[in-house]
């Protein structure tokens, strides 16, 4: 089974209101064919409303939605060339896996024999060959999720929609299934729109991430760009923990800036900043600690936690309390240790407040 024509997605000035409440004020975005794009954000940010409008389960108050170049703004869900994988899987409990996967095909008028053959192909595609006769209750959570993905894929949609698809799985299974989804998307080349509030999922599966806040796009770009060069304190903290530290930009030379925190100076990407007060996002693993009472930037460890493959510290400094992650478990430092603080080359970014 192949996806012959992955579709693009375009939102043009979409507004969505529920009574007097405006969930999406003015949203414009473009998703290229054959890419997996994640809508990421906290609860209430508008990501699920956006997905539901794309699926045809909600209609915008104003604006246009195009799929594969076709205006589908007011089309009902059953007339859109999309398939959706729900958070709850939405499998029929009285049907076996094969019948669940074949259901959409038969409902669209395909002959039963052909539908079941394609359903068997779909189950094999997601790694469940020979399991078609099992009821959902006889499958693990991960297997049920794969049945739901197979059911969506056999319809050969232009766009596959995934709404929090891993939220009902335990942590270890989530890692495995997200890898399977990403490998499947890359192998078949279909367009996918993936909704989650989990930044690890978004980083692991996406070609691009759209971070939403209050119904607007806070930042979008490739995963690495959003993680390493967040545009704001909100993005820095939402894309993984970050220390937000006050600093001074003391010099700008081309695309680079020299910043100062206390008496520590460091070179970072200038990002169009001018000399003066600024904010710095510092990843916990971009900080190094050395036992020392002296240094250009010093502090005192107030808390130490050993977590097997790394040690976490809280360090009290004149610039505020820093959260630090250090892989050097063999030399864990005790609370009340005075330390000199330095920054690594990567994981430091100037941000807008």
Swiss-Prot record:
Record protein name field: Fe(3+) ions import ATP-binding protein FbpC 1
Family: Belongs to the ABC transporter superfamily. Fe(3+) ion importer (TC 3.A.1.10) family.
Record's keyword terms, sorted: ATP-binding, Cell inner membrane, Cell membrane, Ion transport, Iron, Iron transport, Membrane, Nucleotide-binding, Plasmid, Translocase, Transport
Function, as annotated: Part of the ABC transporter complex FbpABC involved in Fe(3+) ions import. Responsible for energy coupling to the transport system.
GO cellular component: ATP-binding cassette (ABC) transporter complex
Pfam families listed in its UniProt record: ABC_tran (PF00005), TOBE_2 (PF08402)
Reaction(s) the record says it catalyses: Fe(3+)(out) + ATP + H2O = Fe(3+)(in) + ADP + phosphate + H(+)
Recorded superkingdom: Bacteria
Gene source species: Rhizobium meliloti (strain 1021)
Residue stretches making up the ABC transporter domain: 9-239
One function term, GO molecular function aspect: ATP binding
Quaternary structure note: The complex is composed of two ATP-binding proteins (FbpC), two transmembrane proteins (FbpB) and a solute-binding protein (FbpA).
InterPro entries: AAA+_ATPase, ABC_SmlMolc_Importer, ABC_transporter-like_ATP-bd, ABC_transporter-like_CS, Mo/tungstate-bd_C_term_dom, P-loop_NTPase, Transp-assoc_OB_typ2
The protein's Enzyme Commission number: 7.2.2.7
Record: residues binding ATP: 41-48
């Amino acid at each position: 089974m192949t996806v012959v024509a992955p579709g693009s997605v375009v939102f043009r000035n979409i507004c969505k209101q529920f009574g007097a409440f405006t969930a999406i004020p003015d949203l414009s975005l473009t998703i290229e064919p054959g890419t997996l794009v994640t809508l990421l954000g906290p609860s209430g940010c508008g990501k699920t409303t956006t997905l539901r409008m794309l699926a045809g389960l909600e209609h915008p108050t104003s604006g246009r939605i195009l799929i594969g170049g076709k205006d589908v703004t007011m089309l009902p869900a059953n007339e859109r060339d999309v398939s959706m994988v729900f958070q709850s899987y939405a499998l029929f409990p009285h049907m076996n896996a094969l019948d669940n996967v074949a259901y959409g095909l038969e409902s669209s008028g395909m002959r039963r024999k052909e539908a079941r053959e394609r359903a068997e192909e779909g189950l094999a595609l997601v790694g469940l060959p020979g399991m078609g006769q099992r009821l959902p209750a006889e499958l693990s959570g991960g297997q049920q999720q794969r049945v739901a993905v197979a059911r969506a894929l056999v319809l050969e949609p232009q766009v596959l929609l995934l709404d929090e698809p891993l939220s009902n799985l335990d942590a270890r299974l989530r890692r495995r299934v997200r890898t399977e989804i990403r490998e499947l998307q890359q192998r078949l080349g279909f367009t996918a729109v993936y909704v989650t509030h989990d930044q690890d999922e978004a980083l692991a599966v996406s070609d691009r991430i759209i971070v939403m806040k209050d119904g607007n796009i806070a930042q979008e770009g490739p995963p690495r760009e959003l993680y390493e060069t967040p545009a704001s304190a909100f993005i820095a903290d939402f894309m993984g923990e970050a220390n937000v530290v006050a600093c001074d930009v003391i010099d700008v030379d081309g695309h680079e800036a020299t910043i100062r925190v206390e008496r520590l100076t460091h070179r970072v990407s200038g990002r169009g900043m001018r000399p003066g007060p600024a904010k710095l996002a510092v990843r916990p693993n971009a900080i190094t600690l050395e036992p020392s009472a002296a240094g250009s930037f010093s502090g005192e460890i107030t808390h130490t936690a050993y977590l097997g493959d790394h040690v976490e510290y809280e360090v009290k400094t004149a610039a505020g309390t820093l959260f630090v992650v250090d892989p050097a478990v063999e030399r864990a430092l005790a609370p009340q240790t005075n330390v000199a603080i330095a920054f690594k080359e990567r994981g430091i970014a100037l941000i807008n407040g």
